């Protein structure tokens, strides 16, 4: 099982994997550490991620970006109108959900936001599997803290359509906080004052501040505040608007009448912004922008800051709100940790620092911090990965109430109740009690619709409690208990319902110290009424999630498109293989194969190559995979004898070389053995001579006597 964390961004998506006792950010097929969050459609297949970015300018009307900001939205939402400014494809209604109308496989098609996100998730899955070499199903996904129940359900549905099972949808800044805290060994103990950190995330499309308290082995989010329309793209848009006016006056061209020109200027504006983050001025040059006109401009940092002053004037708002919700002051904050690509703009950093009156901290990778935090979260939740135990306690950002119809038998009954308040711990469970004689319905909705993003409906879900009936008793009410839970994803459900009965039971009497009071040798008891669980009640839920039939149909469509994409990719690969084979064989006929084929054979092969090449660049440009394979086999069949002669020649040369080497090796071995034998003989002779000398020295000397 893999341990994967995904920072699903509006501009780019970053994938992190926990492995080798650490967390690695993986690269995509072109070795980039971030994959463009784009889905494009063409006449033969889809372009997702890097291919979509490559094709974007030439395929504007069929390329969809800002995918996550469309999740769970409707076409009439004011926020969707804002998103249309940043999305080149046409946004339309698709069965009550916003989607895009594109031309795919030569015909007009509509895809919902959930389907578009599922397509991108399939790409993320493929990229991850190519890196980790195992099947990927479970992961942790990041979402903005301001996402509602409906938006979170849309992301979950999309992931399931792509064959993924998110273990958690984690808020962006919570993921960053987890990545920051889990590696710290000096966090305060349970009885000490917590370390308070403000995590400020200035991303491509939104700006978030979370106040988080850390203690050893745990983090607790105290508050989160957001500006949904403050990010890097808004700075790019300010530059775009300025350049539009400048080009209109200087070159008499209106780029807003040409979508491709807008796209090119927007890309140039993004580069300008990055250059101005490190320099006092930056040039802009675009060749043949419109009507064969080359445009030039020079922007200073001072001019840029004047353009974005309306944005800079709002920097303090989420910071103030986060502190107010946490009931803290600036002095209570120990560290201000800043992440997100948008935070590289110097004036943004200056405003944040001026607000807190403290130095900012940049100890985390601004582009990858959230993905790493997601990977850590996945490791904690994974049963197969051992990681330091670290508790993550997030909060609910919008209060939720339940409403119901008044029971005729209970005239003074309330008809609504705020069950989950803003700031409650997430996940969270509450038990609701109802006295009923017949089945009844409840509706869950957000208490303050004006706090929700755009024109989001406050409706969360409708829950019907079945199996309720009058009982045989003096009051004849059934006591119904409902278990309402906001789960780890931040999604509300009535998980179960059951009924209880009041019964008298014997209970031991305890004194003020908690010890059982004795009566003689037996514990003293008393009769008390307690509610005893007697049985389950069926719950029928109606929520914005896709129903099983719709989800299965979406899964089938996605799998069919994946197979179509694969067939197109395989066909293109075979086409390239055929083209390469033609060039390669033609060159070899004049090189390696020159002496191995007769002129007649060469002419036949050259003629065949010319014929196939002409076909390839004419009617064969759009052939099927099988046809390309057949053409390759035709050429191989004709050139086979020549190629075989070359292989035979190479093999003969290899064998001759091998025999030569073996002969040289044998000769060398014999020479070595002869040398060793000679040395051994000489050594033996020397030892024999030495032994003779020793023998002579030990022999008795002759005695000479006088006559």
From Swiss-Prot:
- What name does UniProt use for this protein? Heat shock protein hsp88
Per the record, which residues fall in region Disordered? 662-707
Q: Which organism is it from?
A: Neurospora crassa (strain ATCC 24698 / 74-OR23-1A / CBS 708.71 / DSM 1257 / FGSC 987)
Q: Where in the cell is it found?
A: Cytoplasm
Chief location of this protein? Answer: cytoplasm
Q: Name one GO molecular function term.
A: ATP-dependent protein folding chaperone
> What does the record note on quaternary structure?
Binds hsp30 independent of temperature or substrate.
Looking up Gene3D superfamilies in the UniProt record yields: 1.20.1270.10, 3.30.30.30, 3.30.420.40, Actin, Chain A, domain 4, Substrate Binding Domain Of DNAk, Chain A, domain 1
